[in-house]
Amino acid sequence: DALNRQRLLDAQTFIRDELAQEGIPFAEIEQRLVPVPGDENEVDVFINVTEGQRVTVAQVQFSGNESGGDDDLRGAMGIKREGFWWFRGGSFNEIDYDSDLESNIPALYRSQGFLDAEVVSDTVVVDPTTGKARLEITLQEGQQYRLNSFSVSGNSEFEEEEFSSLFTSGEGGVLSSLGLGGGESTNVEGNIFDVEAFNGAISQALEWYRNEGYLYAEINPVITRLESEDGSSPMVDAAWEVQEGPLALINRVSIVGNDFTHEWVIRNQLTVIPGDVYSQDRLIRSYQSVSSLGFFETPMPFPDIEPTESGDVDITFEVAE
């Protein structure tokens, strides 16, 4: 093949990533191009890898975490300290560590009302003799926000009272930590605003819409900050802006790949019928029923949903015998 230096760099990146997954994040990789004797247009490629010490996490230290202890933060991380038992190896994985810094730790803080929390610096200190590492993470929490109000706009299929079942404390809704729908929501101090739960409940609300045929529904979360004027905790007004979109009907249901099984055997398992309003729940149950026949390779690919020009959908079930 023609020499491609980008492919050589990609090979080094692949090797480095694979070693990092095994707890060897600081490998040295050297590349050499050696001319082939007697052929000036060819070279042999040699990649020399010096793995270095396998790194395990011995300590994880935090600073700047004024609102809570280290244990909660460690529990939110994918990186774990080495333990006494064999299944707590504590290997250092750079990809997981980056995910902890950029996602897992900030998500924990956002669930506790700290909307601006961030990791401002980190250091990995490795003992070159033992390979044991100490992770030093510095945090800036920012202010803790509480909930002032919640509202929904653009909704006609579901009333705002119906949405409240998602976050009424007494009903164990997805947003129960917000305290909405009950007396606690009118508390002067407000409830701590769990933005992770607030955003997560959107998936449940969209599932409602998809089960009623609103396949194209969208919900835009809006968080408006209300700064404190008297030294009390700052608050937020939280809202969902709903765009329900058109109602989608099922135009056509096709089955492909059934070379031996009669089509009616499969269609008897389907609860999605042409002319019906689209329902995500019925589509999933149909998929599960066909899979459970035992005639086809598993896992089956999920049915393909193809929108038509009119906004309706064609559904295709693909099976392999």
What are the functions of these language-model segments?
Residues 1-321:
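Periplasmic polypeptide-binding modules associated with outer-membrane biogenesis and secretion
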